């Protein structure tokens, strides 16, 4: 049997649970499908269900066999369902666990699963339930992988108790050094992804994913602190998480003023200038770059126009709007500065982006150069 119970609510007083398999052949099986219920007349009677005979269909999935209509049985007809002692024991044990689930959790809204028959997992869950701040801190992007590796190292070591005692006795300075080493490892991992993909990967989704997993990189662009509000945020719909309207790749905000920052992501291969001269020594910005600039400015205009509607609809749905539109910043991340091999190329690009009043243009290699700078700073 599985070590967890899957639960899906069907109403506020009932939830169907995963099937309990009692008998099985290569083509048929008998299952019991339990439900946990809120029984107001008899609170202890909190589990019900039905036996289902299934056959394996052409798609290799289990299909319910035809249902019998008891009302059509004649006086001399009868139906017998027999299960052996092993199946009865399985059913009894599993049903008792479902009673325990209802007693502890009741009927909760949504779909979820609960672990069973594992006291170690139960202890872990109880620990985090009593200290939710600890769980939140451990699952932060920059700590979860380090936590996993540290735990694996401890439990596979011959003397885990000694390791834990040593960690407990570390001085504050030693802990700071340990945190620094973990931070450097994460920075180098991101830098490795950049070096491996910068010349070959032309997928916008890939680079959006890299920056989404490492949102702190984007924060390096700004002199003021910023926090991520949402990725692929809708700026022209009912809420910033709506399924229609315009969407910007990343929506950041200043944590103090809440002023919005809109970031549009292209790829390292995005051309920055045209290959041919406009005039002698003068090159125009490439249409892919100017298009991205126009796009993010359009998002800004739409957001400013729709902000009141977004805020109102968020309020109606109980969602807090975590950003404002005082003077929203716009950023485009595209191309690589290293591709501008000629002096005239670099001058034309710099003239273009420096004269943009409302949009900051930064290249991918400039962005990841800041990651290199952080590594050098931490390594001393």
From Swiss-Prot:
The keyword Lyase does not apply. Keywords: Antiviral defense, Hydrolase, Nuclease. One of its GO terms (biological process) is defense response to virus. GO terms for molecular function: nuclease activity. Coiled coil: none annotated. Only component of antiviral defense system Shedu. Expression of Shedu in B.subtilis (strain BEST7003) confers resistance to phages phi105, phi29, rho14 and to a lesser extent to SPP1. May be an endonuclease. This is Shedu protein SduA. It comes from Bacillus cereus (strain B4264). The gene is sduA.
